[in-house]
């Protein structure tokens, strides 16, 4: 969606609809600096929310960097709430010549293993509710990996090939008593698939000390009931 003034673009916004999850994802809000006090961003979001309601969407979500105070203030003003904080790390792929003990077999038998309200699948930097249907699809595609101790899952991750970043694999680190092994497994997997970059997204506040692991910046996942 683009708004023009005298045939010159002054603002834009993008949205993606997820009918199965009854969700709209809003991103890419840009407003020319000369028009930022005109309430254009709020009007664009409101228009998309109305469109989402007409499509039977029940929630609207967006992701905002923690240091972006103007966007956070606007989102809160129009009814969005922070539902979680996510940390972003980057790492290079690497050949790991050791037995790590990560598997994709029988990691998830049921969505009951998750807190449905707070579980997400990250696709192209969009946080999608992890429904039972979505979970089964990921499991069948062998994108869910885990480390077990006496048949109990102690580390859980979702690994996907990024559609947003070139030559990149995404590790969503869901939980981890020993996340180092999951990270090393992802490094090795990326190396095998000829990817050079890894992006790690997690609610965990810190990760093990691994060479070249860079802590980028945190984001807030915002949500509004429609």
Can you describe what each PLM-predicted range is?
Residues 17, 63-64, 81-94, 214-225:
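Conserved catalytic-core motifs of GNAT/GCN5-like acyltransferases
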Residues 78-165:
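Amide-forming acyltransferase catalytic core, primarily the GNAT-like/NAT-type
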């Amino acid at each position: 969606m683009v708004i023009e003034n005298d045939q010159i673009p002054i603002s834009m916004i993008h949205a993606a609809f997820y009918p199965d999850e009854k969700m709209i994802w809003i991103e890419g809000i840009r407003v020319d600096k000369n028009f930022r006090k005109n309430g254009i961003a709020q009007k664009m979001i409101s228009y998309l929310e109305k469109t989402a309601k007409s499509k039977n969407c029940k929630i609207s979500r967006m992701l905002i960097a923690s240091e972006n105070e103007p966007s956070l203030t606007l989102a809160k003003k129009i009814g969005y709430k922070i539902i979680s904080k996510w940390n972003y790390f980057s790492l290079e792929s690497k050949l790991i010549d050791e037995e790590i003990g990560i598997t994709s077999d029988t990691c998830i038998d049921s969505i009951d293993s998750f807190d449905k309200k707070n579980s997400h699948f990250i696709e192209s930097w969009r946080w999608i509710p992890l429904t039972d249907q979505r979970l089964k699809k990921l499991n069948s595609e062998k994108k869910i990996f885990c480390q077990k101790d006496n048949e109990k899952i102690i580390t859980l991750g979702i690994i996907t090939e990024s559609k947003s970043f070139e030559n990149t694999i995404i590790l969503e680190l869901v939980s981890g008593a020993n996340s180092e092994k999951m990270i090393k497994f992802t490094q090795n997997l990326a190396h095998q698939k000829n990817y050079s970059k890894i992006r790690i997204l997690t609610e965990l506040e810190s990760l093990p000390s691994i060479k070249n692991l860079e802590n980028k910046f945190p984001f807030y996942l915002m949500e509004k009931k429609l």
